[in-house]
Amino acid sequence: MISKKDISFIQPSRNNLKYLKWSYDSIRKNGGSEPTICVADDFSNDGTWEWCEDMMKKDPNFKAIRNEGPKRLGHTILYDELVEIADTPIVGIY
């Protein structure tokens, strides 16, 4: 049987803090605190990384990585990196 602890949601982002907050709230509302949420920030300048740092302190099932730039990596590369940090057998793209 699959448990919520077996699931990670991965989400790359660039300057999309409003959507990240919405998706975080949606996952937590519907899945509780057990699924892991993994975010990759692609050199944002809208406060995304600061929010991610704060969430990593508050939520033990939240992980984030950051592209320090200045060149963007893009979603494809970031999805690959997110799959690497997701430590569950099931990974959902969000």
Protein language model features and the residues they cover:
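A structural signal for isolated positions on well-ordered beta-strands in alpha/beta enzyme cores
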Residues: 8-10, 36-38, 63
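Conserved donor nucleotide-binding strand/loop of the catalytic core
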Residues: 53-73
